[in-house]
Amino acid sequence: PKDLRTARAAGDIGALLAVLAGVETGHVLQQVGQAFAEVWEHGAGPAKRRGRRSVEQELESATMNLSNALSWRDGAGDAPLAAELIARLQGREPEGRPLPVDLGVLAETMASRDDAGNGAYLDLDTGAVLPVAVIAEYGGDPESGVEELGIEPGHEWIVLDDPAEATDADRRDFARALSNGSTLDDFSAGEALNRAMKARGAKNFHDVLDERGLVAVWRTFQGDRRWGRAREALAAQGLRPVGSARSEGPEKSEESEGSAGSAGPGEPGESAESEGSAGPSH
């Protein structure tokens, strides 16, 4: 949500804790974890309306709880994020070269599919993100420069791609999370999604999402998984995301940021047309 992004950008401890107070965050651990990482990166920011030490103690406690939740879930990208949060608590610099990249834009662009090319180009010098398909349209090579896009030569770029099979895995995990949920509605929805994935008839996965009012929940679930895969891809390159840079990826919506306040199974946030944007947890 917008308030979470605002707290992240400001590095405001009090605002971050207020946004998350009483909210179930198990479905958005990557996105909430990134907000915490950026607050720590900013030196723990201004604490308003309460004693600073009290707020810092709240931050430390919440950071430890979040690191534990990430370690328990153990999905793609959860281990490096948990380790980063622990390093902050211990007063150490986290592992990885910091790169000012917008992790949400990178995750979404990595998942983009186009006849001209799949995935994202990432500038290892600036953190800028561009869809491979956009570069392909100009027939250029970003390392040689693409004048029409304002890309100067001499930077090092790599291609990062979210595996096509990841979507099927996300669907199965989403259905499983609902089936293991705490209510009969969760269980019923999970079983309906499992049947839809196995059936060859007209009623498919997205029909069930729409009928059950779970489209936003699915977006959030899949989005958080994509953030994790993007973080893991960066960690494999020895990189650590620390904030946003100029990016030319797919335009982000309010929902692509994920929604800390909108869900886990039972409430949990992709559209039926596109496989994603920004999820319940494991």
Feature annotation, model-predicted:
Residues 217-249, 280-282:
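Acidic, proline/glycine-rich low-complexity IDRs
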Residues 167-226:
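Amphipathic protein-protein interaction modules
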Residues 28:
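Contiguous mid-protein beta-loop-alpha structural module that forms a pocket-lining wall or clamp
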Residues 8-9:
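Helix-boundary capping/turn motifs
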Residues 40, 44, 198-201, 213, ...:
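Short alpha-helix boundary/capping elements
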Residues 247-278:
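Long, intrinsically disordered low-complexity tandem-repeat segments
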Residues 2-5, 15-22, 31-163:
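The feature captures two recurrent sequence modes
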